[in-house]
Design a protein with these regions (language model features):
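Short secondary-structure boundary/capping segments
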Residues: 45-47, 59-60, 96
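Short acidic/glycine-enriched loop/turn segments that link adjacent beta-strands
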Residues: 37-41, 63-64, 97-102
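Vicinal oxygen chelate
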Residues: 4-14, 25, 32-34, 60-119
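Short, basic, helix/turn surface patches
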Residues: 55-64, 117-119
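Short, charged/polar, Gly/Pro-enriched secondary-structure boundary elements
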Residues: 50-55, 111-114
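Core segments of cupin and vicinal oxygen chelate
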Residues: 2, 9-52
Length: 119
């Protein structure tokens, strides 16, 4: 089952400008990685002061929309439990996350898209 909202991933054309802006609002840059093997598209985690959630900055123009990431205990287990639910569309089945664990992407019956993250 869903545990919490992990982060909100948002698109930016200029990662460094956005990092500086969100730091001025009190967020802290806590990690940085690449979204692809070619190291063309960056992901930067900006943590809120209470440490419970993040804004993730991304610069991939093919993903220029907001994504809500939901933490689950076990991504593969969640997928197995819901893969036969005809109201759920699986955009991406579980795959390894470069930061550890797994990721899957689902579309809910109300057409909202959620990125599931966990082990």
């Amino acid at each position: 089952m869903w545990k919490r909202i992990e982060c909100l991933a948002i698109y930016t054309e200029d990662i460094e400008k956005s990092v500086n802006f969100y730091q001025s609002l009190g967020l802290t840059k806590v990690w940085e990685t690449y979204q692809d093997e070619e190291k063309q598209w960056s992901l930067v985690g900006m943590r809120f002061p209470d440490g419970n959630s993040e804004v993730v900055l991304k610069n991939n123009p093919n993903l220029n929309f907001a994504e809500t990431e939901i933490a689950v205990e076990d991504v593969k287990g969640f997928y197995e439990a819901f893969k036969t639910n005809l109201e759920v569309e699986w955009i991406r089945t579980p795959f390894p996350n470069s930061l550890g664990g797994h990721v899957a992407v689902m579309k809910a019956p109300d057409d909202n898209v959620f990125v599931l993250v966990g082990k």
